[in-house]
């Protein structure tokens, strides 16, 4: 009978990059982690002194057991249990990286070091975006099921003197987008605005 130590979810070593390529990252997480498609993760590479960002694209159950059908056995839970050898395998697409020294953002043309720490970003991690964004707010940054409240998504007013379309199916947030967008445009007072909302 196997006795496995239960996962210490507070141990950051459980969230670590295990590989793939410069085009696709893979990391593991405890089996009971609440992860979602579209969630943005921060990958801290202390070897290269950079912070990578990636968006989750797939989640699957995985284990370290040699028996690939261990979880279909009648007494699987009794013999194997859910511990540190059972985990979630997470696939993610790279978004880019920021140099910790200078703060410059780069396209993902390199790969994080193996076993780099994977964590949730906070508003401060996205501070580099404030230099890249404009002054017209259109909403807040989303990460999976959550909103990163400290990170407003803004577009530069210089690109607005032209026609713009907002297209989506019902319930996708068009009206909310237009509400925030119009309020931000009125606050800036740099141009006129005509909104057509056909039904």
Residue ranges: model-predicted function:
Residues 100-158, 163:
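P-loop NTP-binding catalytic core
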Residues 137-199:
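Glycine-rich phosphate-binding loop of nucleotide-binding enzymes
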């Amino acid at each position: 009978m196997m006795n496995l130590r239960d996962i210490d979810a507070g141990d950051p070593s459980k969230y670590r990059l295990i590989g793939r390529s410069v085009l696709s990252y893979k990391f593991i997480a405890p089996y009971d982690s609440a992860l979602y498609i579209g969630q943005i993760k921060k990958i801290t590479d202390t070897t290269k002194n950079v912070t990578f960002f990636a968006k989750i694209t797939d989640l699957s159950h995985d284990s370290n057991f040699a028996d690939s059908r261990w979880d279909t056995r009648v007494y699987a839970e009794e013999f194997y249990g859910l511990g540190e050898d059972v985990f979630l395998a997470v696939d993610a697409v790279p978004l880019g990286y920021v140099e910790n020294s200078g703060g410059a953002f780069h396209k993902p043309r390199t790969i994080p070091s193996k076993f780099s720490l994977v964590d949730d970003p906070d508003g401060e991690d996205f501070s580099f975006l404030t230099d890249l964004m404009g002054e017209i707010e259109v909403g807040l940054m989303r990460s999976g099921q959550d909103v990163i409240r400290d990170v407003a998504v803004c577009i530069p007013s210089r690109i607005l003197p032209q026609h713009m379309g907002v297209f989506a199916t019902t319930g996708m947030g068009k009206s909310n987008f237009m509400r925030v967008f119009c309020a931000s445009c009125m606050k800036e007072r740099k141009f006129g605005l005509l909104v057509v909302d056909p039904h």
